[in-house]
């Protein structure tokens, strides 16, 4: 039997680090008037359910009625004065908000605002179960509603509208740079590690490195098992989200802190200053690395505590996420192109299945990935599996809303990044300069551009692997075919092509086999 493989915290986090699409929620403005003054508030609504005008001038003025003291789950909850032509404010809970909307509509209400006690989350649910619901449904925070009552009094009228967004947002450029930079640097770093392995002076060093890396190498069988576990984890998250989301947050904190340490420690080791050490249990530890570990833990803890602070917590999440992706691309190894094809192919099917097929299976007709992205059961916690960048272009009036963001799943970086890392290692093994590495990196960039183009045209979140996998696999295959190295590239072997490096090493450290003497 082969060595038993253990799954590290980083590997466990990778199981759920694949694309989660945006839901159909959209920010809108609630323009409230009362006591001779006006104020704007943020609300979330589903544009596929109800359309809103794009300007304040075209919005209709509606009188607001506070029904937060009643659950509005039965017709008897409607007050005697009625709610006809009103925008009613109801509390979250007791029954489904779509049931509340149906009752409000029967009472003649024109709109329903659901007050949530925590941060806003997108309205989601199976609209097909309530096809008769036509009124506007929107969500506002309890904090905003309380401020509205204190500032504007009891006699409030509201206008609701949703300013149109430009088709292109420069946030796409930022995400593009982050993604390409991460896969390129991770692949290059993996190549440097491979070069160090091949230049190991002694056979013992090589064997020690080889055994160490066996735990981090994905064989074809391991790849299949990995994808199966991914599917199981996705289903478990779907049914037990409200508990498992905190497990995933904890895993991300541990894995990202370790990854950030590994990335920064690699840089610090290149600095020839401040190398003082202290002895602890017979081992010498550099003081600067001790401080570094404390810093990395502190960054992860601060993010965990303030993860819902949308104004700035995204910066920490992106830093931790980039480090997490870099470390996995450098550490995890696909031994050959065959494993790359199996992994990327299966994860492409995984992505398509959970985005496009699961709506035909789930009871509410929603994609499992979309449900997890929104937070099932109205859960305000989100899985930290994405790079988040606030939109750089948005109207000043939208500043009252939670900062709108564009996202890219970790899986859209890590999965193609593992292929690019293999290409770089193959370059090192064969001495083929950077041809495979550069070609696959350029192909990844083209795939990202294609993803953004489709995103703009379709105006809907896209499973990026649908475009990244074909671009990278086809490009790598064409390069290997043109260089007549397909067989070698397909089978791969981290230790099969070391003759030229052995010769170079032996010239510096000549060792004569047999009965001859090692030169001193």
UniProtKB/Swiss-Prot annotation:
**Key words, A-Z:** Endosome, Glycoprotein, Hydrolase, Lysosome, Membrane, Protease, Signal, Transmembrane, Transmembrane helix
Expression (tissue specificity): Ubiquitous.
Please describe the quaternary structure of this protein.
Interacts with ITM2B.
- Family that this chain belongs to: Belongs to the peptidase A22B family.
Q: Topological domain, Cytoplasmic: which ranges?
A: 194-220, 269-285, 333-340, 421-437, 482-520
**Name of the protein in its database record:** Signal peptide peptidase-like 2A
Q: Where in the cell is it found?
A: Late endosome membrane; Lysosome membrane; Membrane
Stated consequence of mutating residue 412 to A: Loss of intramembrane-cleaving activity toward FASLG, ITM2B, TNF and the simian foamy virus envelope glycoprotein gp130
Motif range for YXXo lysosomal targeting motif? 495-498
């Amino acid at each position: 039997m082969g060595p038993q493989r253990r799954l590290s915290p980083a590997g466990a986090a990778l199981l759920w680090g694949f694309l989660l699409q945006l839901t159909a929620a959209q920010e809108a403005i609630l323009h409230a008037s009362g006591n001779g003054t006006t104020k704007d508030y943020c609300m979330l609504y589903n544009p596929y359910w109800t359309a809103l005008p794009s300007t304040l001038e075209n919005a209709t003025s509606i009188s607001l009625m506070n029904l937060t003291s009643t659950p509005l789950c039965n017709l008897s909850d409607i007050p005697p004065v009625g709610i006809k032509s009103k925008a009613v404010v109801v509390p979250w809970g007791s029954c489904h908000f779509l049931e509340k909307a149906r009752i409000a509509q029967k009472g003649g209400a024109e709109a329903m605002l659901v007050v949530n006690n925590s941060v806003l989350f997108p309205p989601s649910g199976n609209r097909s179960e309530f096809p008769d619901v036509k009124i506007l449904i929107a969500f506002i925070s309890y904090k905003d509603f309380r401020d509205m009552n204190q500032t504007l009094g009891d006699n409030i009228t509201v206008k609701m509208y949703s300013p149109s967004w430009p088709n292109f947002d420069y946030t796409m450029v930022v995400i593009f740079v982050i993604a390409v930079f991460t896969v390129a640097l991770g692949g290059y770093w993996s190549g440097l590690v491979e070069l160090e392995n091949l230049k190991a002076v002694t056979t013992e060093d090589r064997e020690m490195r080889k055994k160490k890396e066996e735990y981090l190498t994905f064989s074809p069988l391991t790849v299949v098992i990995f994808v199966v576990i991914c599917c199981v984890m996705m289903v478990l998250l779907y049914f037990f989200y409200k508990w498992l989301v905190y497990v995933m947050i904890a895993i991300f904190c541990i894995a990202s802190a370790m990854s950030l340490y590994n990335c920064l420690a690699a840089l610090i080791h290149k600095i020839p200053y401040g190398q003082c050490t202290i002895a602890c249990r017979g081992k010498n530890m550099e003081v600067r690395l001790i401080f570094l570990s404390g810093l990395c833990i502190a960054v992860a803890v601060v993010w965990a505590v303030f993860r819902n602070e949308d104004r700035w917590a995204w910066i920490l999440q992106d830093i931790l996420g980039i480090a997490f992706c870099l470390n996995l691309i450098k550490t995890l190894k696909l031994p050959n192109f065959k494993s790359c094809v199996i992994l990327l192919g299966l994860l492409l099917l995984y992505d398509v299945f959970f985005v496009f097929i699961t709506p035909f299976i789930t009871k509410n007709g929603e994609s499992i990935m979309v449900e997890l992205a929104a937070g099932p059961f109205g859960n305000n916690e989100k899985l930290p599996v994405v790079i988040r960048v606030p939109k750089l272009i948005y109207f000043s009036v939208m500043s009252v809303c939670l900062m709108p963001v564009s996202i890219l799943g970790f899986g859209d970086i890590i999965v193609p990044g593992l292929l690019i890392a293999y290409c770089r290692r193959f370059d090192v093994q064969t001495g083929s300069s950077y041809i495979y590495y550069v070609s696959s990196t350029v192909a990844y960039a083209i795939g990202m551009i294609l993803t953004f183009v489709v995103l703009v045209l379709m105006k809907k979140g896209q499973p990026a692997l649908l475009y990244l996998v074909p671009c990278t696999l086809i490009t790598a295959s064409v390069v290997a075919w043109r260089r007549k190295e397909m067989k070698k590239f397909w089978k791969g072997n981290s230790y099969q092509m070391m003759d030229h490096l052995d010769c170079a090493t032996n010239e510096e450290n000549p060792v004569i086999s047999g009965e001859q003497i090692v030169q001193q």
